[in-house]
Amino acid sequence: MRKCCYARRVTVPDSLIDEAARRFALLSDPTRLRILALLLEREPMTVTELSDSLGIAAPNVSQHLARLSAGRLVGREKQGRSVRYRTIEPSLHSLCELMCSALVEQAERLSVHPSRARAG
């Protein structure tokens, strides 16, 4: 058991920390992040729609969707002859908003204080 990093009063079992690490690993790939961002914006979408929108080969999109699906971040639904994908993890939108906001704030700080970028 470990104390949660943002709310120190909450104890999180190691199994949940392991699951969080697996999910963050899924989010560490730029292509998967692009797929998730597009799904959050326009879901549900087919592999072909994702492939065309992202300029990525359909087999590559399918492989990434399979990983995201196995990680329970996206789900699939059959509509006639096609399969459409959507996000199923409710926290994804909040997590993406948090990260984007933090990156924008950091970029703004660095543009005001460019010497901080070099200090790195």
Give the role of each language-model region:
Residues 52, 63, 69-70:
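Alpha-helical residues within the helix-turn-helix
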Residues 1-19, 41, 89-120:
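Amphipathic alpha-helical dimerization/coiled-coil segments
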Residues 36, 65-66:
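Short, hydrophobic-biased segments on the C-terminal half of alpha helices
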Residues 32, 63-64:
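Histidine-centered divalent metal-coordination motifs
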Residues 44, 67, 72-73:
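Short hinge/loop at the helix->beta-strand junction immediately C-terminal to the helix-turn-helix recognition helix
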